[in-house]
């Protein structure tokens, strides 16, 4: 996979990670400087020329929800505050409160860590305006890598991170109607 980065295409994986998957590259790219000049899949191995199965283009990078409508699905992006970090997991309560966790520190080095938003709780979905009426940030430290949310009791979720640690978090207003406390 290649991505566009400052006017050129770069492999999504680092030289070391690609070498682990394709050992033939160890001989072809003996230095990081040589690997840095890679522009497409044909540079990795000429045998790949013309064998790429498919090319895809991503046109929408915002996080949001898809609403089921009579004529198909409609994408509704989250607010700008919710676009500042990746979204790792989403929990939707029976009354419609949406809770998500974000942040991730282990991207490839070109992309850097994503520590802008640990997560939020979004309350009071307005079908007419297609937006949530209230929101609150989660009481989480930026240095965790949250992965999974599950409800354990009214107003309380359990969060699992990448290292297997579990953390109980209280979400104001969860299962208490749509009001933020």
PLM feature segments, named:
Residues 1-181:
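Acidic, glycine/proline-rich Ca2+-coordinating loop motifs
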């Amino acid at each position: 996979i290649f991505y566009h980065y400052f006017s050129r295409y770069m492999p999504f994986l680092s030289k070391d990670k690609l070498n682990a998957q394709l050992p033939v590259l160890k001989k072809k790219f003996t230095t990081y400087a040589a690997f840095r000049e890679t522009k497409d899949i044909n540079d990795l191995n000429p045998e790949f020329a013309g064998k790429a199965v498919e090319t895809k283009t991503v046109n929408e990078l915002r996080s949001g929800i898809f609403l089921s409508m009579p004529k198909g699905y409609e994408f509704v992006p989250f607010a700008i505050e919710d676009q500042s970090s990746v979204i790792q997991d989403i929990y939707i309560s029976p009354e419609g409160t949406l809770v998500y966790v974000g942040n991730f520190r282990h991207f490839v080095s070109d992309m850097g860590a994503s520590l802008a938003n640990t997560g939020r709780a979004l309350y009071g979905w307005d079908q007419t305006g297609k937006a949530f009426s209230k929101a609150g940030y989660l009481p989480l430290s930026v240095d965790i890598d949250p992965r999974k949310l599950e409800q354990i009791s009214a107003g309380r979720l359990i969060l699992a991170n990448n290292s297997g640690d579990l953390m109980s978090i209280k979400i104001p207003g969860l299962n208490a109607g749509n009001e933020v406390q």
